[in-house]
């Protein structure tokens, strides 16, 4: 079993999370996303026009998969989604996502205008279990 410290270190690296939600017809919807993990929640930026926005408005159940390109290390997390639409309040998390993945972040005012113009919202995924109960492989 992977230690919580190893899981935390793995999640701190710049990588994608595959977010799975449930379509209306019951099929899974999967999408790769940049993310930020703050030790309690996973944060993903999206827009109101995306399928995942509609899915998580209807049904907050989610499954998250964070892996590396080889596929030999991964963490699987059952979670519950919350849509956060107050962009100004969530600006630190939008900033953290960009910084984690090596992108420059404009000043707050310019960043807020861009996020608003794009119709951005923040998806906050709260794990349904503590990290010690997540399925993880290759992190031993």
Region annotations inferred by a language model:
Residues 1-16, 107:
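Extreme N-terminal tail/first-helix region
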Residues 7, 52, 90-93:
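Amphipathic alpha-helical interface surfaces
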Residues 11-12, 57-58, 116:
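Alpha-helix boundary recognition
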Residues 14-48, 54, 62-66, 75-78:
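Short beta-strand segments
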Residues 15-16, 61, 102, 130:
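Generic structural signal for secondary-structure transition and capping sites
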Residues 51, 56-59, 138-139:
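Short amphipathic alpha-helical segments
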Residues 69-71:
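Mobile beta-alpha loop/short-helix "lid" or hinge segments that flank ligand
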Residues 73-140:
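Charged, gly/pro-rich active-site loop segments
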């Amino acid at each position: 079993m992977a230690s919580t410290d190893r899981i935390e270190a793995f999640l701190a690296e710049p990588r994608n999370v595959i977010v799975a939600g449930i379509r209306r017809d019951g099929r899974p919807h999967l999408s790769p996303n940049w993310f930020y993990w703050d030790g309690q929640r996973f944060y993903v930026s999206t827009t109101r026009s995306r399928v995942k926005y509609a899915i998580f408005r209807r049904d907050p159940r989610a499954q998250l998969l964070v892996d590396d390109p080889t596929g030999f290390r991964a963490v699987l997390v059952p979670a519950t989604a919350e849509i956060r639409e107050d962009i100004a309040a969530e600006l630190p998390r939008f900033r953290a996502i960009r910084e984690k993945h090596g992108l420059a972040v404009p000043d707050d005012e310019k960043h807020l205008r861009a996020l608003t113009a794009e119709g951005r919202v923040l998806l906050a995924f709260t794990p349904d279990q503590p990290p010690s109960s997540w399925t993880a492989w290759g992190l031993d």
